[in-house]
């Protein structure tokens, strides 16, 4: 909806297509669907798809610009741009700022996209949450990883909270939501750190 509102604000004509209203339900593949949309004269295509890498694949397949509005648990660069804009609006220059991203990092497309953008702007990024949702492998991408929320909040210039991505998980990655909230929830006392 946000892209549609933004486009209409800029006087663009918008056609919203859902998977249910497209030929995908009749067996047409995503590539052919997008090629048909291009043939109908689209100037750009905004896509949100459950398959990781779908936007990149399509950008290499067709000639019109593809805007990635989220692809599975892979990326969500448009949300990251909005988050980074908001952080810069509130904090100014992000170089050297300490940004903590707390929550379900493993299944979050927003966390990855924010990490790449924030690092490019010189921010220090910390991922925090339970070890089952914040694996150490994210250190290889440039993040500091901690499973101690108090350490993550110390000296943070900004904290981003991510919800648990239940829809992308096939099993529970923590004993219960109440236990997760008790250990990793941002409480008023912690927000003053």
Protein language model features and the residues they cover:
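Short glycine-rich anion-binding loops that position phosphate/pyrophosphate groups of nucleotides
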Residues: 50-51, 105, 163-168
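Short amphipathic alpha-helical segments and helix-helix/interface helices
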Residues: 4, 34, 55-56, 115-116, ...
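Short, flexible loop segments at the rims of nucleotide/cofactor-binding pockets, characterized by
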Residues: 21-25, 44, 103-105, 138-139, ...
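Phosphate/diphosphate ligand-binding glycine-rich loop within oxidoreductases
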Residues: 1-85
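Glycine-rich phosphate/diphosphate-binding loop of Rossmann-like nucleotide-binding domains
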Residues: 1-6, 89-162
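Amphipathic coiled-coil/heptad-repeat helices and related helical stalk/stem segments
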Residues: 29-30, 51, 111, 145, ...
